[in-house]
Amino acid sequence: MRTDWTREEIAALFDLPFDELMWEAQGVHRRHHARGEIQLCTLLSIKTGGCVEDCGYCSQSAHADTGLKATKLMDVRAVLQAAAQAKDAGSKRFCMGAAWRNPKDRDMPAIVEMIEGVRAMGMETCMTLGMLSKEQAQVLGMAGLDYYNHNIDTSPEHYGNVITTRSFQDRLDTLEEVRAAGINVCSGGIVGMGETRADRVGFIHTLATLPEHPGSVPINALVPVKGTVLGDMLADTPLAKIDDIEFVRTVAVARITMPKSMVRLSAGRESMSEATQALCFMAGANSIFTGDKLLTTANAGDNADAALFAKLGLRPMESEEPMRMEAAE
């Protein structure tokens, strides 16, 4: 797979006539993935709110005024019960997210128990816990964690307009620690945060030129939450939501430049029309989050997803054992 894409090449893809871009993306998708199969994932907040980071989009930031009450890390048994319910509902991957800048070492034993317990159910595991040290990444790798999510969020150029408490390089460093520990990388970002198309080019370029393409690439549409910096700033402006065609273009370019990655249609789907979601699937999105909630924001819901799948002739992807990366010596 190519990891030497240039920004000029990616910009040219964005500029293609829409039908040509969709044709190219669907062709790439069919060469590397089963047609009509969508991976179902569930995301659980195992520790909500109180995060010291100032991410402008996030209702869980301590800098936001959303009325969200911070919680402690969930009990392991409660997490495993939620995982069992997700499995019964058809999910193949269980993602666990904690609103931390980085995990404390004292929390790692419980995190390991969660990973081992979910894997014992036959589900893929994913964690998003913030930045990781080398030692913490190794602990997660030894526990058998399949994927670690750490989004780059946006382009390097736009990043400082969204977050100031963690650098773009900090994010890349964590991804490197994850790869070195033999864990598959899950990394994507958010569109509709006031960025330009050039920023969306830079966002895709960063992911597509990593040493290895992420195993999963979640693409989120900003959900403006009142009380967050971006929610208040963009709620009453045209920048609050990029148009649907531009969002689909972003999905298509991600598919073309990262052919084997799972491209996940993530936050913001609840407000998308069925037609827009259908175009995203045609453009190469082949993974979604199920359930009524994503961390603290609304999601489409299982009933709506089942109805949409029936209309489009889509089917849930059967679980496959993820390929384990080799840990660096």
Curated annotation (Swiss-Prot):
Q: Which residues bind [2Fe-2S] cluster?
A: C95, C126, C186, R264
Keywords, A to Z, come to:
2Fe-2S, 4Fe-4S, Biotin biosynthesis, Iron, Iron-sulfur, Metal-binding, S-adenosyl-L-methionine, Transferase
**GO BP terms in the entry:** biotin biosynthetic process
Q: Which domain of life is it from?
A: Bacteria
Question: What metabolic or biological pathway is this protein involved in?
Answer: Cofactor biosynthesis; biotin biosynthesis; biotin from 7,8-diaminononanoate: step 2/2
Names of required cofactors: [4Fe-4S] cluster; [2Fe-2S] cluster
Keyword Transmembrane assigned to the entry: answer is: no
The record's listing under InterPro entries reads: Aldolase_TIM (IPR013785), BATS_dom (IPR010722), Biotin_synth/BioAB (IPR002684), Biotin_synthase (IPR024177), Elp3/MiaA/NifB-like_rSAM (IPR006638), rSAM (IPR007197)
Q: What is this protein called?
A: Biotin synthase
Q: Where does [4Fe-4S] cluster bind?
A: C51, C55, C58
The reaction(s) annotated as catalysed by this protein in its Swiss-Prot or TrEMBL entry are: (4R,5S)-dethiobiotin + (sulfur carrier)-SH + 2 reduced [2Fe-2S]-[ferredoxin] + 2 S-adenosyl-L-methionine = (sulfur carrier)-H + biotin + 2 5'-deoxyadenosine + 2 L-methionine + 2 oxidized [2Fe-2S]-[ferredoxin]
According to its UniProt record, the EC number is 2.8.1.6
- Family membership noted in the UniProt record: Belongs to the radical SAM superfamily. Biotin synthase family.
Residue ranges of domain Radical SAM core in the record: 36-260
Q: How is the cofactor bound?
A: Binds 1 [4Fe-4S] cluster. The cluster is coordinated with 3 cysteines and an exchangeable S-adenosyl-L-methionine.
Q: Which residues form a coiled coil?
A: none
Q: Which SUPFAM superfamilies match?
A: Radical SAM enzymes
Has UniProt tagged this entry with the keyword Transferase?
yes
An annotated Gene Ontology molecular function? biotin synthase activity
A Pfam family hit = Radical_SAM
Q: What does this protein do?
A: Catalyzes the conversion of dethiobiotin (DTB) to biotin by the insertion of a sulfur atom into dethiobiotin via a radical-based mechanism.
